């Protein structure tokens, strides 16, 4: 029984290490996409994007649009959002916040540095919004970190892999 466990664990380790290797090496020859290329790949259209609001509790909402969702807290100290999508839809996001009683965005918390969660910083920062992020997320945002999407496949793209 002890040997069977060892064989199982060894097999699991070897099988999972291939995915780690692929993640670390897949982007060496892959073409990097800019934001326009990524939005086209995901089928996102900022112009036709609608922001949908859902109330979670008094003063607490979630906004759905394109990419990551946005948490919104309305309180006596102002409006706090968690994640902020893209500058191209910020006017729609701010309109949705206004519709629920907020005025502007006072604080934006970034959960992480991915473009669909933090790219809106580029619109909010110049407006005076206080932006909060973990120091590692800040480093990745400042360095223009690359997201390896080579392991992300949809049924439509499974036969057309470029990674």
Residue ranges and their predicted role:
Residues 1-8:
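Bacterial N-terminal signal peptides that target proteins for export
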Residues 10-17:
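Bacterial N-terminal signal peptides
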Residues 52-96:
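Conserved beta-strand hairpin/beta-sheet module of binuclear metal-dependent hydrolase folds
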Residues 106-116, 137:
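Metallo-beta-lactamase
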Residues 118-127:
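Metal-dependent catalytic neighborhoods of phosphoester/phosphodiester hydrolases
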Residues 131-150:
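Surface-exposed loop and adjacent secondary-structure segments within mature catalytic domains
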Residues 153-158:
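Conserved small/polar residues in nucleotide/adenosyl-binding loops
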